[in-house]
Every structure is written in structure tokens, then in C-alpha cells.
């Protein structure tokens, strides 16, 4: 049997080396965007949400750690909240939450991760909660 794995510390260190001290922003995209793992920079994204109350959010209280029980390196943060997103009815629907490593503008800001995030905007509060299993937004397993 072939064995090939990263230690939990290496998983954590991979996140730490790339993201420690970085400004990480969250964008919400509509289904106009077609996810593509070959996309590198935020300038390659399309379909960013445009509605009342929307703005890109910066992750706060970022913590990078390893979880030896779940065998992951992970990045957790305070859940970003949009207080009143979209019109009262007929607002756009989100399809994805995208995490980027911000660097002056979209042409230099690297895409970290694209996650499914379906929400019909209706002027209500929206909180982007972390993955329930890992209690994190990003992880390497």
C-alpha cells in the first residue's frame, strides 16, 4: 500500500506561510461566475454581487491552527456580517463566497478559495458562517 500524506503541522504551516498577516477579503458572486481552478487573481472573477448593503468584507480575528483530531490545518475568523443585504424582494441570488488575499487591487489580489454560498438577498442580515465540521473558512486536509 502506498502512503503519501502531509503532517498536520505541515498543513498548518502551509496556510501560515502564505496567509499569516495578510488581509483576507470575502466577495459574494452570483451564478454569472463559472468557477475555474486556473483563475489566479480577483480580476478574473465575474458576477460580483451588486445590491444595497453589499461590500467586500475583510476577515477579522484570523487564527491559523492545526487540528489533530480532524487532521487539518485551518484558518478561522470572526464571521463576516452584512447587515441588510439587497432589496426587500426580488434581489439577486448569491452562488459563491470567494476568499482573496488582498494586495492593492484586483489585478494583484490572489484567489484563495471559492465556496458554494447560495442566498436569496431580501434586505435581511446575512452572516457567512464557517464550515460546521472544521469550524473554519479555509482548511487543508
Regions found by a protein language model. Give the residues of each.
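Small cysteine-rich, disulfide-bonded extracellular modules of the LU/uPAR three-finger superfamily
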Residues: 1-94, 102-141
Amino acid at each position: 500500500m502506498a502512503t503519501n500524506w502531509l503532517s498536520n503541522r505541515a498543513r498548518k504551516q502551509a496556510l501560515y506561510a502564505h496567509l499569516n498577516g495578510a488581509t483576507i477579503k470575502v466577495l459574494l458572486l452570483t451564478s454569472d461566475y463559472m468557477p475555474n481552478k486556473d483563475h489566479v487573481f480577483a480580476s478574473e472573477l465575474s458576477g460580483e454581487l451588486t445590491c444595497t448593503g453589499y461590500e467586500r468584507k475583510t476577515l477579522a480575528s484570523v487564527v491559523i491552527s492545526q487540528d489533530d483530531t480532524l487532521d487539518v490545518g485551518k484558518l478561522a475568523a470572526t464571521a463576516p456580517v452584512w447587515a441588510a443585504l439587497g432589496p426587500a424582494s426580488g434581489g439577486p441570488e448569491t452562488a459563491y463566497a470567494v476568499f482573496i488575499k488582498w494586495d492593492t487591487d484586483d489585478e494583484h489580489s490572489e484567489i484563495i478559495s471559492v465556496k458554494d454560498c447560495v442566498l436569496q438577498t431580501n434586505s435581511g442580515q446575512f452572516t457567512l458562517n464557517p464550515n460546521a465540521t472544521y469550524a473554519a473558512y479555509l482548511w487543508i486536509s
